[in-house]
């Protein structure tokens, strides 16, 4: 009726905030987000396959947008930006044994597969052979593992975020949960993500759409006028 189709996707859950060490907590969280990215890409491939076989859901494969809230926001941003091995093996994503000095990636692609859900001894590939490209992502209260993941030429993105969120940081810093303490360090929230995406020119295409003068954007910008910082494309929502 409204001209678009919405799919509410499910993905694998499971991370352990009560793990014995910070490294294990961080690894658990990273693996959970990584698996969710794989599952979401599998879902996009499923819909593209269905499109070629009758299009049961009536989708337009030229206009696929991924949106998520909280953990789903992390998935959306990771979906758009993680596309090479070097990005998931940055020094902060490595576990160094205190006794032997052995270095182990927190994400072992030989075990759980790559970011598209291919390969891996313990991974089952779903709907191979179809594209899992999307055309835009929206994060609500999410974040990104490292700002270096963002590169010129990647898809547009927007974000909604509470500047004073006590768990999901708005700028760049640590992730901590009241019941578990520090989980991982130096991640970036919506403000810094959108600032870099805009600087790279990835969102330039959005300015041709109502040129930022639609009533929703104007209302969000007005509401954000007294917030802690503001970057085009990130809309600050109050917390209450």
Question: Predicted regions: what is each one?
Answer:
Residues 198-240:
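C-terminal catalytic histidine-bearing segment of alpha/beta-hydrolase fold enzymes
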Residues 98-205:
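The feature captures the conserved acid-bearing segment of alpha/beta-hydrolase catalytic domains
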Residues 5-10, 63-67, 75-77, 135-140, ...:
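Structural recognition of the beta-strand scaffold that forms the well-ordered cores
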């Amino acid at each position: 009726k409204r001209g678009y189709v919405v799919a509410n996707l499910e993905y694998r859950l499971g991370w352990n905030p009560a793990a014995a060490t910070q490294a294990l907590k961080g690894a658990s969280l990273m693996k959970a987000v990584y698996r969710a990215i794989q599952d979401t890409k599998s879902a996009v491939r499923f819909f593209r396959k269905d499109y070629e076989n009758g299009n049961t859901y009536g989708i337009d494969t030229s206009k696929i947008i991924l949106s998520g809230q909280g953990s789903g926001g992390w998935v959306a941003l990771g979906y758009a930006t993680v596309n090479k091995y070097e990005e998931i093996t940055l020094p902060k994503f490595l576990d160094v044994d205190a006794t032997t000095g052995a270095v182990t990636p927190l994400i072992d692609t030989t075990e759980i597969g790559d970011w598209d859900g291919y390969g891996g001894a313990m991974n089952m590939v779903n709907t191979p052979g179809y594209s899992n490209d999307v055309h835009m992502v929206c994060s609500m209260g999410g974040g990104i593992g490292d700002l270096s993941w963002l590169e010129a030429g990647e898809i547009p993105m927007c974000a909604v975020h509470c500047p004073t969120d006590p768990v999901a940081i708005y700028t760049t810093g640590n992730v901590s949960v009241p019941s578990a303490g520090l989980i991982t360090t130096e991640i970036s929230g919506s403000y810094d993500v959108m600032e870099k995406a805009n600087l790279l020119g990835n969102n330039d295409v959005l300015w041709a759409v109502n040129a930022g003068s639609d009533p929703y954007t104007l209302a969000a910008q007005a509401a954000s006028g007294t917030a802690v910082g503001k970057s085009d494309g990130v809309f600050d929502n109050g917390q209450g």
